[in-house]
């Protein structure tokens, strides 16, 4: 249990230290290089919390940083999260809902420009609401399957419990 609060505290610490002088990916890599106590799972979760914060922080300007982290995680996740289960167990049933439904659940009345500030610069062919809300989801990662491994790769992903979409014979979206 305290591990999850440690994740929140560490993410909060990282965000307070970050000044924007360098790309965040480089900054957080240096942070973890200096702090050897974090394993790969810890680094992954803490990084995810930080990136969720960057996607959603402008939606909640008047709340504490740690609560922004939790709300960001809630909005950007569709899988069960131990942090959400611990901090806001009443939100667990909403995790599988769409980002738009989650925003309504949190009673967030913000403008779409608060998610993506350059919405007015988009072409008319782009649906501004769908485009802004798409920033709350992690984009797919595409895997190219080499010839001869068309059956092996999907089997290994299924065995590992990783959900994926078969795009064609040689491509998978994770």
Locate each region found by the language model:
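Class I Rossmann-like S-adenosyl-L-methionine
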Residues: 1-174
């Amino acid at each position: 249990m305290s591990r999850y609060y440690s994740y929140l505290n560490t993410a909060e610490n990282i965000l307070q230290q970050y000044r924007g002088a360098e790309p965040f990916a480089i900054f957080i890599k240096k942070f973890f290089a200096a702090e050897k106590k974090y394993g790969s799972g810890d680094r992954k979760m803490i990084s995810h919390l930080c990136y969720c914060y960057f996607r959603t922080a402008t939606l909640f300007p008047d709340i504490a940083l740690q609560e922004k982290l939790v709300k960001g995680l809630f909005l950007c996740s569709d899988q069960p999260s131990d942090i959400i289960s611990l901090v806001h167990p009443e939100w667990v049933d909403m995790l599988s809902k769409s980002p738009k439904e989650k925003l309504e659940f949190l009673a967030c009345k913000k403008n779409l420009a608060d998610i993506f500030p350059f919405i007015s610069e988009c072409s008319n062919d782009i649906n501004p609401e769908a485009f802004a809300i798409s920033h709350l989801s992690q984009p797919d990662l595409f895997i190219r399957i080499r010839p001869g491994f068309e059956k092996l790769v999907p089997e290994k992903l299924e065995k590992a419990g990783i959900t994926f979409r078969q795009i064609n014979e040689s491509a998978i979206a994770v």
